Design a protein with these regions (language model features):
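Extracellular beta-strand elements of beta-rich domains used
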Residues: 67, 139-142
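A short beta-strand element within beta-rich, extracytoplasmic domains
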Residues: 62-74
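Beta-sandwich interaction modules
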Residues: 51-62, 96-139
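Short, surface-exposed beta-strand/strand-loop-strand elements in extracellular ectodomains
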Residues: 75-88
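Trp- and S/T/G-rich repeat-edge/linker motifs of beta-rich repeat architectures
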Residues: 90-96
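Short beta-strand/loop motifs in extracellular/secreted proteins, especially
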Residues: 52-54, 65, 78-80
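Disordered, acidic Ser/Thr/Pro-rich linker "stalks" and the adjacent N-terminal cap
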Residues: 1-59, 145-172
Length: 172
C-alpha cells in the first residue's frame, strides 16, 4: 500500500522569490540562480564533487515536510543530507535538524516524519564516485507536501497496454 504525495511548483520554498542562495562552489556557465528557475533543463552545477552545498536563506522561518533534489547527476553512492537551523551554516546547534536523503536516480527526496520550521536550509552533497567531475541538479525541493486522503488498494494495479499496429499494403 502506498500514498501519493506531491509538492506543487508554486509551493516549493526553495525556488520562491525573496529567498537568497549561497553555495560552496558554482560553475559560472551553470549559476546558482538557475535553482530559482522553474526549468529543470537549466541546472546549477558545482566545480567539485566533495563537500558541496547550497544554502537557502528563506528570510523567515518556513514549514517543511518534503525535501529533495530534482534532475541530478549524483552517483548511487552519494551522501545527501539536509540541515535546517535558525542561523546561517546550520548544524552547529543541537536544536538544528539533520536529515539524510535516500539516493534515487534523477530525483532524490524524503518525506519527513514531522514538519520542521527553520529559516536556513543547507543541502549537502558528497559524491566521491561521481565520474562527471561535478555535481549538477535542476531544483531543490523544500516545502509542505500534499498527501491524498486515499491510497492504492492492495492487489489493485494497472498495466500499460501497447499494440503494434502494422498494415502491409498490397505493394509491400
Amino acid at each position: 500500500m502506498g500514498n501519493f504525495t506531491y509538492l506543487q511548483q508554486a509551493s516549493n520554498k526553495a525556488s520562491v522569490a525573496g529567498s537568497s542562495l549561497t553555495s560552496s562552489t558554482a560553475n559560472s556557465s551553470y549559476p546558482l540562480s538557475n535553482l530559482q528557475d522553474d526549468k529543470l533543463s537549466r541546472p546549477f552545477r558545482t566545480t567539485g564533487i566533495s563537500n558541496q552545498w547550497v544554502e537557502i536563506d528563506a528570510g523567515s522561518p518556513i514549514n517543511v515536510k518534503l525535501i529533495g533534489f530534482a534532475n541530478h547527476n549524483f552517483s548511487s553512492t552519494a551522501v545527501l543530507t539536509l540541515q535546517g537551523g535558525t542561523v546561517p551554516n546550520p548544524g552547529g546547534d543541537s536544536s538544528d535538524v539533520l536529515e539524510t536523503i535516500t539516493w534515487r536516480s534523477r530525483y532524490a527526496f524524503k518525506l519527513l516524519t514531522n514538519v520542521q520550521e527553520y529559516r536556513y536550509w543547507r543541502f549537502n552533497v558528497d559524491d566521491l564516485n561521481n565520474t562527471d567531475g561535478y555535481l549538477e541538479w535542476g531544483l531543490n525541493i523544500l516545502g509542505l507536501s500534499t498527501t491524498l486522503s486515499f491510497n492504492f488498494n492492495y492487489g489493485w494495479g494497472w498495466a500499460d497496454d501497447y499494440e503494434n499496429l502494422e498494415h502491409e499494403s498490397e505493394f509491400g
